[in-house]
Amino acid sequence: ARYFLVELTGGVSMTGCAIVYGCGKMGVISLRGAVFFIYLGILFVIALVDWHIQMIYDRFHIMILILAVLDFMLYPEMGIATRLTGMGIISVPMLVLALAIPGAFGGGDIKLMSVSGLLIGGASMICAMCIGIITGGAYVTLMLVRKRLNKTDQFAFGPFLAFGLATAIFLGDKMAVWYLQFGAV
């Protein structure tokens, strides 16, 4: 089942990146699409590793940082201010919570959101975190109801953050605009 999931995720990721970020010459995915396809692959590995051992290795953060620098060179239209906002808008509050409430968030989760913010920007980061909290909260609620977790147990939040980040690279800006328009009504 895992092999099928990996193959399906890879195919959907490549197709999504080609649709959203376009194809280059001769039908090959654009460079920006390739950056996000690689990012999705890293997120997938992070989700699997964190799920099993509750750890996000720094090598993954470094890879995402490299992708963020490359994307900045390929797509300077998303300015440095937007990227720096993305870097701090979620990770700084997570860090404050982790310092105030020991165990609230792991360092790997905080670093993941920081380097991802450099890549996808502030609006998408807010959407990513909302999706991560909703899906993670639904999972924990289900596990508490089934008595597979108790209130003091820790769980891997990385897979839910990764899902939120993956969703945000396709829909983050659209979701932010929708939310702002919804609030204006």
List PLM regions with ranges.
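A membrane-topology feature that recognizes alpha-helical transmembrane segments
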Residues: 1-185
